[in-house]
Amino acid sequence: ASYRAIHDIREEERYYPDARAIDPDDLPQFDLLCGGFPCQAFSNAGRRKGFADARGTLFFEIARLAEAKRPRYLLLENVPGLLSHDHGKTFAAILSALDDLGYHVEWTVLNSKHFGVPQSRKRVFLICYLDPRCAGKILPVFGTDGKALIQVLGGSQGHRVYDPEGVA
């Protein structure tokens, strides 16, 4: 309640049990759409069925919302197996869909251990933007000094933060 009052937010958070049921007309305008579509369809630990797995098609729900709402930026995340799935055809289809929507895409693989997180977890990140003037200003991203988030923030800031030296 306090956060809503401070930031003049009049709407409650909304939770959708199924991304396919989201009506874009029910959403306010926004500048950034973040999505981590299910990775099981592309992961080495999964069966790697790709778009043949219903979970693998949820990227297209993100694309549907992006087409309807036209946010300036998209930030997408998945496992590195997405890059090589079906000999790169799956990733090419995703890039093509984003291009068809008018988004310029930069992507990279980052490992959480380079950003002060006490685990090694590689993920591919796609940063997509409508304005071509953003090109070259976003990536590459590097972990600067290996400090943990708790060391940078100087405390947990009201949330559980994991420190490489233990739970804070």
Where do the protein language model's features map onto the residues?
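Solvent-exposed polar/charged
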Residues: 5, 35, 67-68
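Class I S-adenosyl-L-methionine
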Residues: 22-30, 40-168
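Active-site-proximal cofactor/substrate-binding loop regions of enzyme domains
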Residues: 15-17, 35-36, 62
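SAM cofactor-binding core of SAM-dependent methyltransferases
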Residues: 1-20
